[in-house]
């Protein structure tokens, strides 16, 4: 059990006399499982309207701030403010946890890096990793409040699209190790430059103590800017990873063997050789940082490297599925210029006679949108696509520049594309689906489920 009457009373500063034992904390009644704790938050909808639904699904208790007619009164925990109660629960978990906290941020690669680190650690330790990419303030609080007391390693990812957001979150999380995967043009709509994005990402170090450790991708944009910020914060325990021999951890070789890839890493002068099922290069570059963290923790990196084969892309983040006799690379969860380039390079790497790209808008790029979408044209050509489907207002910039030798179609939105859904998959093709989440390209895959 994650919560009981005693710990809830201590966290919330109230007396709970009835016997309560709960598992994970949920704010969406659709996610409630038997034994969970439902908290009625006020958002676009009032969580109090879904309390009965949560109880029907097996919630062991409900936290509410106004009266709701419930038959089993022993399940009720009444507070003044539900969101404040959630914050108190999260703070209680952090203050009473003996776990080492590893927190990851970056423009792209946060979730895949977090999941890889989880896989490599969970064979030998009790690991908690934040769910999915739920990486804003609410997500962090819900995840932290759902962490088991015996957790040895807690892994969180933090996202942001405005200055100050990460600073607020690390005041609660207090990371022992903080990692920046990279800095790229994601969220440029809300910033004036890459340097401003780097400054916002570096807020992950704002709550560091003298024993905390920074892990940085040396190949990223603004690397020297990050080092300057760390120096100003008097942070000296800095470890880098990347493609350079000057880093603490280096990806020496990535060799495509068809259905497998051969990888050679050097982690603090220890050379590792590993062959794993085929995965794009950009994933294996982030694994360099993951192996570096394993080494920093004093764990056996040779054993950890052998577990790399157990990592597979998560839903919507590069997984390959079969639809209508076509292999489909599902990478529709989000898109930035860097991740779009990586996805098209992935398409280029995978051997196939016929390749199709379904490209959706990259959102939140502001006045840079036209330039950054036009930049994708060369990557599409390099991937040798025979067909290209473009979805969204901004992809019109791509449509205008693609040569006529490529069979192409432009759609204003995914709903317009869906009227032609049966024409998309002709069989024996390799198809990439890539775009920002707001474009909703997942509808294409959901149609065939």
UniProtKB/Swiss-Prot annotation:
Functional summary from the UniProt entry: Involved in cell wall formation. Catalyzes the final step in the synthesis of UDP-N-acetylmuramoyl-pentapeptide, the precursor of murein.
InterPro entries assigned: Mur-like_cat_sf, Mur_ligase_C, Mur_ligase_C_dom_sf, Mur_ligase_cen, Mur_ligase_N, MurCDEF_CellWall_CoF430Synth, MurE/MurF_N, UDP-N-AcMur_synth
Membership in a protein family: Belongs to the MurCDEF family. MurF subfamily.
Location relative to the cell: Cytoplasm
GO CC annotations, alphabetized: cytoplasm
Natural source organism: Rickettsia montanensis
Name of this protein: UDP-N-acetylmuramoyl-tripeptide--D-alanyl-D-alanine ligase
Highest taxon in the source lineage: Bacteria
Reactions performed catalytically: D-alanyl-D-alanine + UDP-N-acetyl-alpha-D-muramoyl-L-alanyl-gamma-D-glutamyl-meso-2,6-diaminopimelate + ATP = UDP-N-acetyl-alpha-D-muramoyl-L-alanyl-gamma-D-glutamyl-meso-2,6-diaminopimeloyl-D-alanyl-D-alanine + ADP + phosphate + H(+)
EC number: 6.3.2.10
Pathway: Cell wall biogenesis; peptidoglycan biosynthesis
Annotated PANTHER family: UDP-N-ACETYLMURAMOYL-TRIPEPTIDE--D-ALANYL-D-ALANINE LIGASE
Name of encoding gene: murF
Keywords: ATP-binding, Cell cycle, Cell division, Cell shape, Cell wall biogenesis/degradation, Cytoplasm, Ligase, Nucleotide-binding, Peptidoglycan synthesis
Class of enzymatic activity (EC top level): ligase
Binding, ATP: 106-112
A GO term, aspect molecular function: UDP-N-acetylmuramoylalanyl-D-glutamyl-2,6-diaminopimelate-D-alanyl-D-alanine ligase activity
GO terms, biological process: cell division; cell wall organization; peptidoglycan biosynthetic process; regulation of cell shape
